[in-house]
């Protein structure tokens, strides 16, 4: 048994709540929608699996190698130690076996599917576009409010600049404020899979939670449907863009 020492609502506030519902119409444009069945506080799929905090485990690391990073030091590694306000999630250390179960059954399974899907798309179509969809708080601690949308392409290294420009322009056309790579330049998923020279393009989209939900209660707001409808437009433009890219490969 793993004892949790924070209220459930604090764990929910760490989630990318309802993002899969915002994008659920993407399949209508021919996209494949892959969403996590576990919350970020259980396993953070947008981390390297080696980003593990040794202090969390009672009998050693689940895997032989751990990688230190500012995220791990802050308690936000692949298996997070802290919740939304920095409070400790667990009342006591968890076992190595419990950590390994999360990594093998959730993390490894998810990323194996992503890798295989991207490989299949490249074999069939000559290219693949991965849009890594997330939500972000409306402000970071005591800093100024964040923009509506933050696009992360690892400063141009994870996808064709035309893709980032198209998405940025599309959001602006719909009335959203947009930032590139600040404060989020793209996480592990974007860095790991974005290989433009191999025709695999990865772009991270962070959506301000204040646009579509009540951040305190973690419930959809009255504007949820508008944001969802706008995202259908974005996905349709992405589909058209990918079709043009595919055609250019055959010329």
Locations of the language-model features?
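N-terminal catalytic or cofactor-binding beta/alpha core of small enzyme domains
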Residues: 1-130, 135-203, 207-251
